[in-house]
Structures are given as structure tokens and as C-alpha cells.
Amino acid sequence: YDLVDAIEGRCRPKQALVRHPQYANLFILASNKREPDKYVSPQAVRLILDNLSPRFDYILIDCPAGIEGGFHRAVASAEEAIVVTTPHISSLRDADKVISVLKSYKLKSVELVINMVRGDMIIDGEILTPKEISDILKIPLIGIVPQDDGVFLGERVAGGDAQKAFKLLAGNIARGQRRIFNVTYKYHGFFGSIRRSLKKSL
């Protein structure tokens, strides 16, 4: 079952949920597997999520890129928003447009996650710092995720920097903390300069 099955009454909303095989309290609701082009109204999505919300502490809605129908369906059902961007200028322009649209919705908060951040490039002044990005976009920073080649290749990297950053991000969301992962810590000092040189040569 998927979201459309629940909307059209072929199953109850909870029957459309798929439990994660490793985490008993994590469930996934597929959006529309069989008819991806079928129109689904924001109101219908909201009804399903309202039905499920008493069962969960958090419902995360993964929003498609761009400001199309899928974006508005997701935002219309949300109470808060997390804008995910990368430090690249084109991505920041897109994020700025998204934030402008989000302001038209009555959301409790709009916060920022910066993905694929390279600490070596920050130290060398090749990309904006997370604080500069947050200041430009005028929304608070809630987390940073460093670029991790293992994640990029689809590998499971236990104990890696990306995992540590995600744990801090989860704590910030769940407990209202503001602990931001330091992506530059490996690139300071003598050995850090060697790491930066090696990173550039790859």
C-alpha cells in the first residue's frame, strides 16, 4: 500500500506504513508508487497525516526539489520546515527562492541544514562559512552535514563524521539544542594542512 491507497480508501492509513527492519519505531509511508503522475490534493495528504499524527512524535515529510505541486503538497501539511541546501551558489539561490515561498505559509519555524560541506574549502576561503550562509538566507542554522565519500558511494560508514553530524542534528530537532558539527576540526594545524593538500589532489 501507499499514500494514494490510504487516500482512496483501499486501506487504513496505518496499513500503508512500512516498518524499518532495524528501527522498530521508524516507519515509512510511500507517496505514490503505481501512479506517480496522479494528482493528489494537499488537503487529502493533510487528512492522512492528521490521522497518523497521534501515533508519532515526529512526522518528516520529504519534499521534492523545486517549487512545484509536490512542494506545495508537502508544505501545506507541515507545521515546521527545514531547508536543506549545499554551499554551492546555485543551490543557495534555489534555497533563497524556497524560503521566500515558505514565508507565505504560516509555519512555526523555518530552519537551515547545510549538506555536503567541506571543511578544507572553508579554511581555504573557497566556499562560504555556515554562518555566512545562514546570515545570507536569514534563517537559523540547525545542522551541518559534511561531505562524506562513503555516503556518496552508498556505503554504510559507522562512526564517520556524517553519522556524528546527523546525531547532533537529530538532537537539535528533538531537544531544541544548537550543537553544530565542526567540519573544519581535521584541517587545522600542520597535519590539517597536509589533509587539505591531499584533499585537493584527489
Which residues fall in each region the model found?
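P-loop/Walker-type NTP enzyme "switch/lid" segment
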Residues: 1-54, 152-157
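Inter-motif core of Ras-like GTPase G domains
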Residues: 51-54, 68-89
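Amphipathic alpha-helical transducer elements in NTP-driven molecular machines
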Residues: 14, 42, 46, 89-96, ...
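Conserved acidic residues
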Residues: 27, 57, 79, 110, ...
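Conserved nucleotide-binding/hydrolysis micro-motifs of P-loop NTPases
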Residues: 33-35, 66, 88-90, 117-122, ...
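C-terminal lobe/tail of nucleotide-utilizing enzymes
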Residues: 104-202
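Structural beta-sheet core signal
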Residues: 61, 83, 111-114
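Conserved C-terminal guanine-recognition region of P-loop GTPase G domains, centered on the G4
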Residues: 92-109
